[in-house]
Amino acid sequence: MGSQWTKDNVYRKAMRDGYRARSAYKLIDINERFNVIRQTDNVVDLGAAPGSWLQVLKTMTEGQLCGVDLNPIIPLENVITITGDFTDPAIQAKIREAMPLVNVVVCDASPHLSGAKAYDQARVMGLNEEALNFASNLLKQGGNLVMKSFQGSDFNELLALVKEKFYSVRVIRSTATRRGSTECYIVAKNFIGDADDDRKKRE
């Protein structure tokens, strides 16, 4: 899928292919290029509604999937869905109970943007840090993280935090991202983890 595709073209293709949103192709593109999700991985999807990434994940892994969002997610067979804010400790406890072993965390979440560039960028960075902290507390050693972000102020500081926790970190643009957008994805592989955390070392 070339970058010359318009938003309407990709939207129509998503509808034809049965995906709930055009963002499905972003995860397909990322996994084809970086092999983030393996056949038996258990995956948590943060900001999962309407569920297009969960639809794609079902084709990539036979492992358990869990989608979390502030908005209800239309159910998918054999997929756990949790409605709530993943930054809320009570919701995090529910996720841990449902998913005791997690290989991959994906996050396509983005705050509602106001149009005030500095304010919006600060909120994006805050959400990214929350997702990174969540992944760090849940992933097993060697696990992977895919997280949407936007390049701007404080992005390099965020990237430095990710590099402290993963052995391999790349910043990429999906071929499905609209031309001119500052949207990017952080693809972080091989979570360093905590050598003293036996739960994270389990296969």
Swiss-Prot record:
EC number(s) per entry: 2.1.1.166
Gene Ontology cellular-component terms listed: cytoplasm
GO molecular function: rRNA (uridine-2'-O-)-methyltransferase activity
Active site as annotated: K148
Gene3D superfamilies, per the entry: Vaccinia Virus protein VP39 (3.40.50.150)
A Pfam family matched in the record: FtsJ
Keyword S-adenosyl-L-methionine: yes
Subcellular compartments: Cytoplasm
Reactions that this protein is recorded to catalyse: uridine(2552) in 23S rRNA + S-adenosyl-L-methionine = 2'-O-methyluridine(2552) in 23S rRNA + S-adenosyl-L-homocysteine + H(+)
Protein's UniProt keywords contain Phosphoprotein: no
Recorded coiled-coil stretches: none
Free-text function comment from the UniProt entry: Specifically methylates the uridine in position 2552 of 23S rRNA at the 2'-O position of the ribose in the fully assembled 50S ribosomal subunit.
Family, per entry: Belongs to the class I-like SAM-binding methyltransferase superfamily. RNA methyltransferase RlmE family.
Protein name: Ribosomal RNA large subunit methyltransferase E
